[in-house]
């Protein structure tokens, strides 16, 4: 944290994927990182330690992408040790006409992550040989039957 140097967060790629899917042309992209803290001591069983009040508990990474079309995409990812009042949350806001906000409190994060990986398998099997970037894969499909039924 003290060095101020960070590798791109996974939101860096998300902005590129969103631009690709929306037909936008990125002209600049920057990332800002901010430490997260908590007002009281936090006991982390995962880290096997207590994080003192005011010490960093994680980081917020904000990625801003400007496009040739004049549309700005800003994404934020927060990874931190949770306090007792914290929970997973997904918030999406679209500013324009009309403005739209979507808020999902306590999504089934583990299940969604696993389902996303499994549902991606048919697209990976059908993809061209060699290295391709994931923005070239089709949108993910929800599999409700046998995976072989999706391999047409």
Task: Describe the residue ranges of each PLM region.
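Active-site-lining helix/loop region of Rossmann-like oxidoreductase modules
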Residues: 1-80, 84-88, 107, 114
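C-terminal helical cap and adjacent loop that interface with cofactors, partners, or active-site loops
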Residues: 81-152
């Amino acid at each position: 944290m003290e060095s101020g140097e960070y590798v791109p967060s996974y939101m860096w790629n998300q902005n590129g994927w969103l631009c690709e899917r929306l037909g936008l042309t990125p002209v600049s992209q920057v990332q800002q990182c901010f430490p997260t803290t908590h007002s009281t001591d936090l006991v982390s069983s995962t880290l096997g330690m207590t994080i003192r009040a005011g010490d960093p508990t994680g980081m917020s990474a904000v990625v801003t992408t400007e496009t040739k079309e004049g549309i700005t995409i800003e994404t934020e990812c927060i990874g931190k040790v949770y306090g007792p009042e914290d929970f997973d949350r997904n918030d999406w806001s679209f500013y324009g006409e009309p403005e739209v906000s979507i808020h999902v409190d306590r999504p089934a994060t583990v299940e969604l992550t696993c389902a996303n990986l499994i549902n991606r398998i048919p697209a990976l099997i059908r993809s061209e040989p060699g290295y391709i970037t994931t923005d070239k894969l089709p949108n993910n499909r929800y599999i409700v039957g046998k995976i072989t039924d999706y391999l047409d």
